[in-house]
Structure formats: C-alpha cells, structure tokens
C-alpha cells in the first residue's frame, strides 16, 4: 500500500458519557485525539485526518497542525462517518485503502497501525482488523471485551467467523481480544455502509457483524498486545503516566501530499 493510496481517518465525537469531552482531554499538554493523530502520522502510512461533527474538536486538531474534516452528526456508526469523510477528502477516488483508527488510543504503537494493512495483501480480503490472545479468565468473560473467533489461514492470521461479547469459543484453545482498528478496501467500505444494520449487529452491538452477515470477508492479524484505550478516569491517568516519559511525535506527513 503506497502512501498516496492509503488514508487514515480518526472518527471523534464528544458523545462519551463516562468521560465527557474525551477527545479533548489533556494528556501532557495535548488533546487526546492529537496524540492519536501524531502516532498515526508516525506510522508513515499516508495522509491522516480526524473526522468529526464537533467544531471544537476540529479547531483543536488544526490548532496543533493536524487535519480535520467536518461530517454530519447523524451517522449510525464510525464507519459511516469515515465513509463520508473519505468521499469529501478524496472525491476523485484516488485513495484505495482506508484505516479507521479509534480516537481513544493515545498510546497506540505506530507498528500496530501498520500491521492492520497486512491481510489486505490477499486480494480475497475485504476488511482487515487486529486481535491479541487473551490470557486471563477475567478478560475472557468480560462482555466489554469483544472476542474474535476465526479460522487460521496463515501464521498469526485468522479468517473471521464471528465477533461476540460472550466467552468464545468454548473449550480448550486460544481466545482472542478484538482490537477496534480496521483497514478497508475502498469498495468494501462503500459496500459496508450501503448494507442495512444486520440482526446480529443489533443484538451484539458490533457493527463488524454487518459485514460478515453481508457475505464480506474480514481477516484478523494477531498482534502481541491490546492498545490501551481510554474509557474511564483511571484509563486517562494511566495514559498520562505512560506518555509523560514518551517524546511527542512530530507531524510527519503534511496534508498537501495527497
């Protein structure tokens, strides 16, 4: 995937109830969403932008040298927001691959962002995502931890069969913690947003099931650990401690290069 053909989009909203204003919370002098943006830039994949329906988020991103695109407020999922942003940023269709990166991963390693592209080297794959092996019963039984169930197709790679909040699969063997980072082929993203919400998507509250129920192929790259998301005040303090000792990446791929 070349830089000019790959776009990283970070959907960000002010809708969090446990941490109000989450994208703009300060971590070491920068808003959280700017940390995510800069780590995506450091991955060296290509152009990076924040997709938001909130003027305050857009203003904060641009004030720190990043790129933001305003989107509608009524999208049913982050993927729908990403598709609108793609269409507005690249109306001529030059971008071939889109990465959807959650805006609450301020400590994510750039190499993990690059890893999500690897399954798309197989032309049969529509969407790629990540997972890490689960090592505790607490994690395996936690409904807030989404489990990825799949069949091995290559070393450290699965073909997704299902995603669930339940403990799965049953019995002995590895279980995997799904990581909410996606890479889409452009046509696959368009097909996904054109599909209606599916029954299992509604039941599990997992939008990726819409793709599986629609007959799309999702492959999962296995990585060593789960990036630390920020959902609670305790998570925020942990991120602040981690980033206090880590240099802040500089923006590396200016918006004019697309």
UniProtKB/Swiss-Prot annotation:
Claim: Magnesium is one of the keywords in the record: no
Gene3D superfamilies: Spore Coat Polysaccharide Biosynthesis Protein SpsA, Chain A
GO biological process: CMP-keto-3-deoxy-D-manno-octulosonic acid biosynthetic process; lipopolysaccharide biosynthetic process
Protein name as catalogued: 3-deoxy-manno-octulosonate cytidylyltransferase
Group of enzyme by EC: transferase
Catalytic activity: 3-deoxy-alpha-D-manno-oct-2-ulosonate + CTP = CMP-3-deoxy-beta-D-manno-octulosonate + diphosphate
Keywords of the record: Cytoplasm, Lipopolysaccharide biosynthesis, Nucleotidyltransferase, Transferase
Cellular compartments annotated: Cytoplasm
Function: Activates KDO (a required 8-carbon sugar) for incorporation into bacterial lipopolysaccharide in Gram-negative bacteria.
Pfam families found in the cross-reference section: CTP_transf_3
Protein family: Belongs to the KdsB family.
GO molecular function: 3-deoxy-manno-octulosonate cytidylyltransferase activity
Organism phylogeny: Bacteria, Pseudomonadati, Pseudomonadota, Alphaproteobacteria, Hyphomicrobiales
EC number of the protein: 2.7.7.38
Biological pathway: Nucleotide-sugar biosynthesis; CMP-3-deoxy-D-manno-octulosonate biosynthesis; CMP-3-deoxy-D-manno-octulosonate from 3-deoxy-D-manno-octulosonate and CTP: step 1/1; Bacterial outer membrane biogenesis; lipopolysaccharide biosynthesis
GO cellular component: a single term: cytosol
NCBIfam families per the UniProt record, alphabetical: kdsB (TIGR00466), PRK05450.1-1 (NF003948), PRK05450.1-5 (NF003952)
